[in-house]
């Protein structure tokens, strides 16, 4: 005669099956938690990259030798800029990168040889020290100097003065504060030039 418990699992088998079920449940819980954490971290990284520290790629040579075609840089959104800051700004659905030369209300004068003078009044302009330039040039210029920068705007120029189209030309003009994306602070690519942007 058959025992009525012959087809039933033993208590050890039940315990092993219970442990396997618990393990699968814990594994799914850890996996779900990890995926949620990764999604949250990715979302925060995207928000920071978009709102606080945009990552930009440089196209063209208007900022050489400081920045060259293909460089990847980090910028910081801020509202205060100084003369000498390298900034990114919106222009015709593109982002351009140039250097701040003069601030709102300041006067700018550029000689035919490319020497740049900046001052609070047209009578007290000083020669701008520009160690980042390889060569000076008047470049593509169709405004009359001396020139006073309008309020809420900055006067910008590229470091490769002979090829850069910038505030010296009415096509770009002075950049409004609301057009500014941010100050470029760090180059992340190429790795050979990894570091702060001066």
Range-by-range predicted roles:
Residues 2-30, 51, 57, 65, ...:
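Soluble "head" domains of membrane/secretory-pathway proteins
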Residues 33-51:
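Hydrophobic membrane-insertion alpha-helices, especially the h-region
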